[in-house]
C-alpha cells in the first residue's frame, strides 16, 4: 500500500473539495456548485497525481542509477515515459471516479441532465491532453535535476489558469489568453458543459478540435526534443552535457 499515492489521489482532492464547499457556504450559496467543487477537485487530483508521480519516477531512476541505463537502452526514453505517463493518467482516473461517486451518493447529484456522449468524448480528450503534457514535462526532468523544481511548481498555476474549480470567464483576459496553450483547458470546458447538461454546439466541436491539435503539438515537440537529446547524450557520453 502506497500512502503517497493515496494522499495525492484521494486525500488532496477531498481537501480541495471541502475548501471549495466551505467557501461556497461562506458566500451564502444555498448549495455548492458540484461541477466545480466536486468534479473539479477530481480533475485537480488527476493533474497533481500526474505531476508528482512523473517527477518521482525520474528522481527514483536517478537515485537508483537506472536513468543512464534507460537512456542508453535500445528502447527509447520516449517510449518508457509514454507508458509510465499513461499509467499515471489512468491511475488519476481514480480521483475523478471518487469525486463522481461522492457527487452522486453524498450530494445526490442528478444524472439525468448529464450529456453522457459529450462527457465521454471530453474526458477522452482530457486524458490525452494530460498524457501529452506529461511526456513533454518528463523530458525536462531527464535533462536537468533543477527542472524538477520547475515542474513541481506547475501544479497550482496550471490549475488556476485552466479553471479546474471555477469558470474561466472570471479570470482576467491576460490569464485566459495564457490558458489557451494548455489542451486540458479546452477539454475541461466541454466536460464541465456536459455535466451541466448542455447539448452539442459549434463551440463544443471547436473546443475538441483545439484540445486535440494542441495535444498533438505537445507530442510532436516531445518527440523532436527526445531525438535531439538522445543524439547529444550518445555523442558526449554525459547526461550533464545538456
Language-model regions, residue ranges each:
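Hydrophobic transmembrane alpha-helices and immediately adjacent juxtamembrane helices
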Residues: 1-242
